[in-house]
């Protein structure tokens, strides 16, 4: 639901300038704080939520206008007019990896009160039939009882393989409040639980904070700082991992044509990382990296949608159908190195 406040384009420029200053400040302040972060820790938290946003190249931080806002930008929960359930299932890389997402979001607060929103979300990533080859025998050329590569040769006996599974879970508890008409602030608390086979497990805790501005003439802008506390993941082996903060800013512009039968939305997200992943990013300045996520969405009578975008360097596209209160969305995600994947999600608005 868009605010009825009549903001001018000048107000939008002011907000955009402020968001830009936040990016620059974070670029100088955050890197020293995350120097001890573990690269790729908590990677499953980055898979995404909802085929609608994914079909737009994940350009959703500046839009965040449905129940998946709890994942993309929790500040958007304050703009929800009605409760909503969202669910998504995906299988990636030849069905090796399975991913599930489920959320319930609802507005709170009565007439005359500041709009607020609550949500609970569950994310799961699982990999089955992982071969554990640690029990295999080998020819010990050095006689030291240790497998030395490449001198020693492994004796592969598939009958001795032990198959395990890995499961990663995350529970998000999210809250948002409208500070004044058109501007909302929100946050999420995250609880992470991971298992690898029967012997390895970990627990983790973290938090996200986001802001969303909704103006007139179809403009909106938002920002989210994920893992603001540097999410800690503690393994039962005594090993500790940490997920470094990432800053993501976004803006969106919607325009309606012909009695609002046709609505086109253009969106752009920019993700700023501080973990020095230069090889996997599109641009970098020192240890600060940048990814760009442009996206488009077209609605016909708010019943049929077509989408396209770029998820960093990977092409994305999708479609959606709304029938009364029920919706189904599909997303196609290309990958420059691995197989493409398909996402299907469903939503119900009460």
Feature names for model-found ranges:
Residues 37-350:
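Subset of outer-membrane beta-barrel
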Residues 18-31:
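Bacterial N-terminal signal peptides
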């Amino acid at each position: 639901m868009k605010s009825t406040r009549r903001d001018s384009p000048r107000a939008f420029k002011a907000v955009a300038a402020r968001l830009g200053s936040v990016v620059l400040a974070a670029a100088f302040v955050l890197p020293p704080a995350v120097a001890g972060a573990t690269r790729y820790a908590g990677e499953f938290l980055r898979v995404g939520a909802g085929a609608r946003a994914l079909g737009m190249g994940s350009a959703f931080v500046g839009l965040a206008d449905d129940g998946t806002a709890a994942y993309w930008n929790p500040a958007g929960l304050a703009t929800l007019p009605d409760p909503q359930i969202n669910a998504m299932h995906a299988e990636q890389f030849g069905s090796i990896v399975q991913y599930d997402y489920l959320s319930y979001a609802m507005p709170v607060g009565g007439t005359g009160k500041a709009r607020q929103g609550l949500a609970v979300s569950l994310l799961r990533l699982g990999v089955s039939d992982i071969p554990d080859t640690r029990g295999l025998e080998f020819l010990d050329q050095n006689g030291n009882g240790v497998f030395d590569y490449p001198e020693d040769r492994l004796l592969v006996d598939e009958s001795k393989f032990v198959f395990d599974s890995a499961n990663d879970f995350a529970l998000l508890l999210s809250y948002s409040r409208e500070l004044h008409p058109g501007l909302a602030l929100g946050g999420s608390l995250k609880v992470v639980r991971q298992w690898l086979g029967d012997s390895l497990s970990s627990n983790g805790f973290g938090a996200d904070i986001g802001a969303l501005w909704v103006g007139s003439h179809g403009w909106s802008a938002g920002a989210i700082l994920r893992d603001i506390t540097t999410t800690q993941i503690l393994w039962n082996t005594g090993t500790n991992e940490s997920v470094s903060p990432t800053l993501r800013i976004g803006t969106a512009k919607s325009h309606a044509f012909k009695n609002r039968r046709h609505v086109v939305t253009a969106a752009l997200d920019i993700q700023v990382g501080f973990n020095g992943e230069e090889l996997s990013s599109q641009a970098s300045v020192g240890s600060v990296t940048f990814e760009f996520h442009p996206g488009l969405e077209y609605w016909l009578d708010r019943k049929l949608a077509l989408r396209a975008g770029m998820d960093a360097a990977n092409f994305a596209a999708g479609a959606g159908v709304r029938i009364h209160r029920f919706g189904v969305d599909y997303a196609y995600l290309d990958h420059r190195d691995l197989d493409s994947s398909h996402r299907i999600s469903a939503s119900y608005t009460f």
